[in-house]
Amino acid sequence: KIKDSVDEVIKIPIRYHRYLLPVPKIKIEKSDVFDFTKKSKFIEKFIKERLARNRRTLIFVPEIGMCKTSVLYLKNSLQDDIIIDFVYSEDENRSEKIKKFYDRKIDILVTTTILERGVTFDYLDVIIFDAKHINFTKSALIQISGRVGRKDYDNSGDIVFLSDKISGE
């Protein structure tokens, strides 16, 4: 029956800690959120709720040029004591920033797909900003989603695909 209703099924085995993979949620926002002309109440609420629960947030953006703009946007939306930074492949301070995030000295880290694999953070939730963007391939979205819930003592979390519409893919 499944084969009749979908194009493809991807089977992902259970993780080593025997907990299921967190399932991404889709949140539709108006398109002006993605060009930073309108604040997103959803993003603001999402981050505040995570911080209240002592969780961190990785926000994936599709292009390097969006990193700095996203940080400025978030700093204007959130309180001053929240520590926000960004990292991308050619960032000279990339290792230092990732370590600070790992050490919980950064609350929100905006990043490109450079962190889609090879890193493990606990107490982590993820937003994928403009998830329908061409730079977020199906495999990239799966890898990014895999950042959440990697520890046996923190085996769940939230993943949100933020978009202005649901694409056919």
Q: How does the language model describe each region?
A:
Residues 49-74:
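Conserved strand-helix element at the start of the C-terminal RecA-like helicase core
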Residues 108-110, 116-132, 158-161:
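A short beta-strand element within the Helicase C-terminal
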Residues 55-56, 105-108:
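Loop/turn-to-beta-strand initiation segments
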Residues 62-65, 84-96, 110-118:
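Conserved helicase motor
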Residues 10-17, 145-169:
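Conserved segment of the helicase C-terminal RecA-like domain
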Residues 2-46:
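Interdomain hinge/linker at the junction between the two RecA-like core domains of SF2 helicases
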Residues 4-7, 80-82, 122-125, 153-159:
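Short glycine-/polar-rich loops that comprise or flank the Walker A/P-loop
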Residues 44, 68-71, 95, 108, ...:
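Amphipathic alpha-helical transducer elements in NTP-driven molecular machines
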